[in-house]
Amino acid sequence: KHTLPDLPYDFGALQPHISAEIM
């Protein structure tokens, strides 16, 4: 798990974006 705060919205929608950031 990465250092991220508990997001109030659906985190699943951000997963693709997060993956792109890590890459």
Swiss-Prot record:
<dbReference type="GO" id="GO:0046872">
    <property type="term" value="F:metal ion binding"/>
</dbReference>
<protein>
    <recommendedName>
        <fullName>Superoxide dismutase [Mn], mitochondrial</fullName>
        <ecNumber>1.15.1.1</ecNumber>
    </recommendedName>
</protein>
<comment type="similarity">
    <text>Belongs to the iron/manganese superoxide dismutase family.</text>
</comment>
<keyword id="KW-0479">Metal-binding</keyword>
<keyword id="KW-0560">Oxidoreductase</keyword>
<keyword id="KW-0464">Manganese</keyword>
<keyword id="KW-0496">Mitochondrion</keyword>
<dbReference type="InterPro" id="IPR036324">
    <property type="entry name" value="Mn/Fe_SOD_N_sf"/>
</dbReference>
<dbReference type="GO" id="GO:0004784">
    <property type="term" value="F:superoxide dismutase activity"/>
</dbReference>
<dbReference type="Pfam" id="PF00081">
    <property type="entry name" value="Sod_Fe_N"/>
</dbReference>
<comment type="subunit">
    <text>Homotetramer.</text>
</comment>
<comment type="function">
    <text>Destroys superoxide anion radicals which are normally produced within the cells and which are toxic to biological systems.</text>
</comment>
<dbReference type="InterPro" id="IPR019831">
    <property type="entry name" value="Mn/Fe_SOD_N"/>
</dbReference>
<dbReference type="GO" id="GO:0005759">
    <property type="term" value="C:mitochondrial matrix"/>
</dbReference>
